[in-house]
Design a protein with these regions (language model features):
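Helix-to-loop junction immediately C-terminal to a conserved catalytic motif
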Residues: 80
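Conserved ABC ATPase "signature" region
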Residues: 143-161
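Conserved ABC ATPase signature
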Residues: 166-170, 174
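A short, proline-enriched helix->beta-strand linker immediately N-terminal to the Walker B motif
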Residues: 185-189
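Catalytic Walker B motif of ABC-type/P-loop ATPase nucleotide-binding domains
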Residues: 191-194
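Helix N-cap at the start of a conserved alpha-helix in ABC-type nucleotide-binding domains
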Residues: 202-204
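H-loop/switch region of ABC-family ATPase nucleotide-binding domains
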Residues: 227-228
Length: 242
């Protein structure tokens, strides 16, 4: 366990040290990461998150690992602002999401990319149209500008021959590539992945893991992956939280 910890930089969710506070108080670091401080969340009186503190660093593949029911999805959704927390703070850089206006929250959400467990693609849209969708909703770019940007990320995730196909016409692994491309098309600062290997065979899982890891390093994104897959941990985990 000791050598595994030293290799992968592992933190327990209930580990209480001064490490997180020192990083949080250092202005050199705070713009590079997500900081979770003393987080509590309960449902119907049952504590799911109990005094959680940790950090997710820029340019690293940060993995939250745990069994079903361990609270990892609640933590991820709390960071995304999908759950109202009971107590504590979540910071994106120096900005606490507990004390921001609706306008600031909207801007922050545009800096986030999300890869959902089931890919969540639009069945009636082509690969290219799925990837263009966030730009259509959130920008005033021309169709030509959106198409050009979509084709850039299509090329980056190796889908150049599938851009005019429907999701039903491509494999599960290719669908996951579409989801990743859609998540990064707006040049996000933060990338969140919920069980990105769900339903994939081991070989394809490794390919998807490596693609996410490469994109994280290439664009210096703060990437947070929610997983129970130990192969992902061994393959790409730079910081592991369990």
């Amino acid at each position: 366990i000791g050598s595994w910890k030293s290799k992968y930089n592992v933190f327990c969710l209930d580990e209480r040290t001064d490490h997180h506070r020192k990083l949080f108080n250092n202005s050199t670091f705070t713009h590079l990461m997500i900081v979770v401080e003393n987080l509590y969340k309960s449902f119907d009186g049952v504590n799911v998150l109990n005094d959680i503190s940790t950090t997710f660093e820029k340019g690293k593949t940060n993995l939250i690992i745990g069994q079903s029911g361990s609270g990892k999805t609640v933590l991820l959704k709390s960071i995304l602002g999908l759950f109202n927390i009971d107590k504590g703070n979540i910071y994106f850089g120096n900005q606490s999401i507990q004390n921001i206006s609706n306008k600031e929250r909207s801007i922050l959400r545009q800096e986030m990319g999300m890869v959902f467990q089931g890919s969540a693609l639009f069945d009636s849209m082509t690969v290219e149209e799925n990837i263009m969708f966030p730009m259509r909703m959130l920008t005033k770019n021309s169709f030509e500008e959106m198409q050009s940007r979509a084709n850039q990320v299509i090329k980056r995730v190796n889908l150049i021959n599938a851009n005019k196909k429907l999701p039903s016409e491509i494999s599960g692994g290719m669908q996951k590539r579409v989801a990743i491309a859609r998540a990064i098309v707006m040049n996000p600062k933060y990338l969140f992945c919920d069980e990105p290997n769900s339903g994939l065979d081991p070989k394809t899982s490794t390919i998807i893991d490596n693609l996410i890891h490469e994109i994280t390093q290439e664009f210096q994104i703060t990437t947070v992956i929610n997983t129970h897959d130990m192969n992902s941990v061994m393959e790409i985990g730079e910081k592991i939280i369990f």
